Structure formats: C-alpha cells, structure tokens
C-alpha cells in the first residue's frame, strides 16, 4: 500500500513536472507560420502580456507571469518589432523580448517625388509618424548639416534597401539615408561629376529628369547627353517632366502648349539650366547613366511613335519637327488627350 502511494505521488509529480516543462520549454507559442509582434515605446508589462493574449500568441498568462518573474522581464520591457515563429517555446519568446532582439525593417526606397512622400514611406514602415519625419526634414539645422536646402533636400536619398530597427527615431533614419548617400558618392563618382562641370547634386537632379523621361536603360545615357549639350550651348532643357513636377500634376499624360507657360523655377521651358532640385529620386543606374553619358551631338529627342518606350534622337530642329509630328499623330491615334 505504501509503495503504491509513493508511486502515485511520483507519477503526479512527474506529470505536473512534465506539464510545466512543456509549458516553458515546449513549442507552445502560436503564430501563423511567422508573424511580427510590435511593442511601442513606453508600453508596460501588462499591456505586452495582454497583446500576446489578444493576438493568440500565448494561450495563458500564468506561466508567462511565472517565467517573467524569474527572468525579471516586467521591468525590462523593450520596444521593438519581434519575429515570432510558430512553435517557439515560451522561454525563447521571453528571452527574445527581454534582450530586445528585434527583427530589422527593410525600408525599400524606389522612386519618390516629394519629401512628403518620403515621410509617409518611413511612417508606414516604422514607429515614428510622418509629422516627426517632416520635423526633421524641415529643421534648419538638418539642412545646414547636410549642406542642402529645401529644393535639394531629396538628393540625400539614394534608392536602395535600408535595414533599420522599427523603433528608430525619425532623426536616426534620416541620418542613415544621408550616411549611405555619402558612401554612394565615392571619389570615382565625384570626379566624374567634376569632369561634367556638375556637382553631385546637379548630377542627381539631371538624373531625376532622365528617370522621369524613360525607364529604358539604352536611352538614359543618350537623354543625359542631350541635356548636357543643351546646358553647354545655352539652350533651355525644355523637359516635359519638369512641367508635371512644377504643376504637381503627376498624372498628366500629355503636355500641351498651355502647360508650358506655368510659372515655376522647376519649369525648364521657362527657365534655363537645371531646375533648383530633383523632381524624383532616380535609381543608382540612372545616376550612373548620367555620369557615364556618351558624347553626342544630339540636341533633341522625342518618343518613338509606338509602344516601345524608346526615343528618336537628332541634332537638327527640322528632323526633330518630323519626329515630333509623328509622335503627336500616334498619340491622337490611340486616344491620348
């Protein structure tokens, strides 16, 4: 009888011990394959625990509280973006949260036009809001430190994928972009810009126009050569994308004569030389296409009268008129007004 009692007690102890071990070390964390759990800055322990319950990552707070007490997590909550994998143990989950071992955010920047676009892009991916980003972008000290003004500010943004922590401050994110911009403009690129009698900011601005003119790599260098020839001979760039930017009418499909007189320093039909700043964030390929533009005699270009996206280039105005007329007929034929 005594032996049965002892075996019974041992069985219960083992059963309870096994259950506790399963709850702590077993794959009890639930997530649809893999999800991200966000802890905002200033969030307390109770809110973290409730969020884990609400999101069905944990099913009970008892063992979470018990283990949190042992790990002294309650007073060490760290904001961040955490990757929770299905089947993770409660111990692993708590260790990750306690250590602040975040999953970084990959901020993918392609083509943006305005600093407001940049602010919204950052706010959509990070804890900081667009207002705090705009505060940094509009700050006089920021502009001075980056040696830019309101028009050239976006030249600090080189399209790429940037890996940063979700709870990084707006200032830290912008500083990261500027740091990468400085790395991009290495000695070789700076020297190529000097050879063109342009600053890196001017190269970037020209590249932004080229970026808006075409997405065809073979044409980018040729278009840049046209702009260089026009600048060097004192001819206005007369670039249609600058009119769209000046008007902030990015959906405009066809530039008409009435649009050309729009009063803005960005309208290169009205003002000679490059606009005072970029009209978008050009790709690194486009920037390099400008830096490596071939030497040509081309002064004019216009899209080919088809859907190829390529352009016809020429030196004489007479030939350009023929090319332009053909393209206008094409637009009329496909109903683009």
Predicted regions span which residues?
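Hydrophobic membrane-insertion alpha-helices, especially the h-region
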Residues: 7-19
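Signal peptide-directed extracytoplasmic domains
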Residues: 19-185
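Bacterial extracytoplasmic/cell-wall-associated proteins, especially those involved in peptidoglycan
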Residues: 44, 108, 127-128, 142-337
């Amino acid at each position: 009888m005594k032996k049965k009692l002892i075996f019974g007690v041992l069985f219960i102890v083992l059963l309870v011990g096994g259950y506790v071990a399963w709850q702590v070390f077993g794959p009890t964390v639930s997530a649809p394959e893999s999800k991200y759990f966000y802890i905002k800055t200033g969030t307390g322990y109770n809110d973290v625990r409730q969020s884990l319950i609400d999101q069905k990552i944990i099913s009970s707070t008892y063992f979470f509280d018990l283990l949190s007490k042992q790990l002294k997590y309650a007073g060490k909550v760290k904001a961040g973006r955490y990757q929770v994998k299905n089947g993770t143990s409660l111990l692993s989950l708590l260790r990750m949260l306690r250590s602040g071992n975040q999953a970084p955010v990959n901020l993918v920047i392609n083509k943006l036009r305005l600093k407001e676009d940049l602010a919204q892009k950052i706010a959509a991916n990070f804890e900081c809001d667009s207002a705090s980003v705009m505060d940094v972008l509009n700050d006089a000290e920021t502009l001075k430190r980056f040696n830019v003004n309101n028009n050239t500010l976006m030249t600090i943004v080189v399209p790429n994928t940037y890996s940063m922590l979700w709870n990084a401050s707006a200032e830290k994110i912008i500083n990261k972009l500027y740091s990468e911009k400085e790395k991009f403009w290495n000695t070789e690129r700076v020297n190529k810009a000097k050879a063109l009698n342009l600053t890196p900011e001017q190269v970037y601005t020209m590249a932004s126009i080229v970026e808006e003119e075409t997405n065809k790599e073979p044409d980018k260098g040729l278009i840049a050569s046209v702009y260089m020839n026009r600048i060097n001979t004192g001819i206005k760039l007369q670039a249609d994308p600058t009119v769209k930017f000046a008007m902030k009418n990015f959906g405009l499909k066809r530039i008409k004569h009435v649009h050309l007189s729009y009063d803005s320093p960005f309208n290169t039909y009205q003002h000679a030389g490059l606009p005072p700043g970029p009209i978008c964030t050009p790709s690194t390929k486009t920037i390099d296409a400008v830096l490596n533009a071939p030497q040509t005699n081309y002064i004019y270009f216009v899209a080919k009268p088809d859907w190829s996206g390529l352009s016809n280039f020429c030196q004489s105005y007479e030939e350009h008129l023929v090319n332009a007329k053909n393209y206008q007929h094409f637009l009329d034929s496909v109903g683009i007004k």
